[in-house]
């Protein structure tokens, strides 16, 4: 069985979430040669649906930085979650540092009710849930924190790694996220 796995942002996608015609033709050639194609991304399954329409295929999906894996038929064959107790502790630490979070479980997008979500339009396929307190959030697939100051995020990542690295994968994917 042959597989080609590709990252999404910055690899398959150009700016503005557009897939080039060249990329579409290349993937189509692979599929016609019976090569299994997979997309690996930090996005959730709902966050890649528009891109799949551009490609015109239903590939394997490795989503949420590996927390979820879906078959071409859409069946979830891996669903790794951060347990609720750990989620609560991590979110409290984030809030203690005066930062906001975006948290994801399947099609649900959680955020603090105190947070103004100006960019929710970029997540139209997710069900938005504004939570009163961190204890109200269930097990999660992924938590995102972003800030314009990379130093703030590096400090937070170090704090979270010291407290939770044995319980959850903690990483800085970009200077501001």
Q: Model-predicted segments: where are they?
A:
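Active-site phosphate-binding/coordination module
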Residues: 16-117
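Extreme N-terminal starter segment of soluble prokaryotic enzymes
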Residues: 1-5
């Amino acid at each position: 069985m042959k597989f080609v796995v590709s990252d999404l942002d910055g690899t398959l996608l150009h700016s503005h979430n557009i897939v080039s015609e060249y990329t579409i033709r290349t993937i189509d050639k692979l599929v016609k040669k019976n090569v299994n194609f997979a997309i690996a991304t930090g996005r959730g399954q709902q966050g890649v649906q528009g891109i799949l329409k551009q490609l015109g295929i239903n590939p394997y999906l490795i989503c949420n930085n590996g927390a979820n894996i879906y078959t071409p038929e859409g069946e979830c064959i891996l669903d790794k979650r951060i347990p609720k107790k750990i989620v609560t502790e991590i979110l409290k630490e984030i809030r203690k540092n005066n930062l906001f979070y975006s948290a994801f479980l399947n099609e649900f997008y959680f955020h603090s009710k105190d947070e103004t979500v100006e960019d929710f339009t970029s997540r139209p396929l997710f069900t938005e849930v504004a939570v009163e307190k961190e204890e109200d959030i269930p097990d999660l697939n992924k938590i995102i924190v972003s800030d314009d100051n990379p130093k703030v995020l590096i400090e937070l990542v170090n704090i979270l790694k010291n407290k939770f690295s044995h319980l959850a994968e903690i990483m800085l994917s970009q200077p501001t996220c």
